[in-house]
């Protein structure tokens, strides 16, 4: 569950806890997108250079917090008692060339889990707008998406993969079989 639509307060976290209790869920996993933290902003230089749209979107949304603020919230929550178990993590955009950078930023920070996600293929933001696919080589994008997915899994940086089928968001399909 992404928590980015509210403040880093116990009151905000309690809204998720209360809903979990209502639904008889005994564990919740809360996370943030890494791009929201200024420390991760350098990973996005090439995707911003690729597209004016992404550049504008990114600079409205990205780097609005410091990672330490999130880590402080995690410590604060862990010092309290809740009727459900709360785990904290990060969803990290996977870029092969930033594996070492990602490892350095996340090691020994106390996260319960890290999710790797692919939102960009060769800097193309495939899950932003359907019209951005116009004129794109769908077969090539799918091929590179799966190459990147394999690299993500082999990196051993992550505990899981976020939305592994995001590539099909707008209904585009390659000419070859995916089975």
Model-derived segments and their meaning:
Residues 92, 96, 108-111, 115-179:
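Domain-core and long-helix interface of multi-subunit machines
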Residues 1-96, 170-178:
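An N-terminally biased module of ancient metal coordination in phosphate/nucleic-acid-related enzymes
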Residues 15-18, 47-50, 105-109, 133-136:
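Short, low-complexity, polar/charged sequence segments that are solvent-exposed and flexible
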Residues 8-19, 97-105, 144-152:
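Short, acidic/polar
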Residues 21-22, 73-83, 102-112, 151-157:
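Acidic (Asp/Glu)-rich catalytic clusters
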Residues 40-42, 101, 127-129:
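Short aromatic-enriched loop/helix-cap "lid" or pocket-rim segments at secondary-structure transitions
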């Amino acid at each position: 569950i992404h928590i980015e639509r509210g403040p880093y307060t116990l009151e905000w976290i309690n809204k998720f806890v209360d809903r979990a209790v209502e639904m008889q869920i005994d564990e919740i996993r809360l996370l943030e997108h890494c791009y929201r933290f200024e420390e991760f902003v350098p990973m996005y230089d090439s995707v911003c250079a690729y597209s004016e749209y992404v550049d504008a979107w990114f600079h409205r949304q990205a780097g609005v917090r410091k990672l330490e603020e999130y880590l402080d919230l995690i410590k604060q929550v862990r010092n309290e008692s809740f009727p459900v178990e709360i785990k904290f993590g990060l969803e990290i955009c996977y870029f092969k060339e930033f594996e070492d950078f990602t490892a350095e930023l996340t090691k020994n920070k106390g996260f319960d889990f890290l999710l790797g996600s692919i939102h960009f293929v060769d800097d193309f933001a495939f899950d932003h707008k359907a019209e951005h696919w116009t004129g794109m080589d769908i077969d090539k994008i799918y091929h590179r998406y799966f190459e990147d997915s394999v690299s993500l899994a082999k990196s051993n940086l992550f505990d899981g993969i976020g939305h592994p089928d995001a590539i099909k968001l707008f209904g585009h399909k390659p000419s070859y079989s995916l089975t």
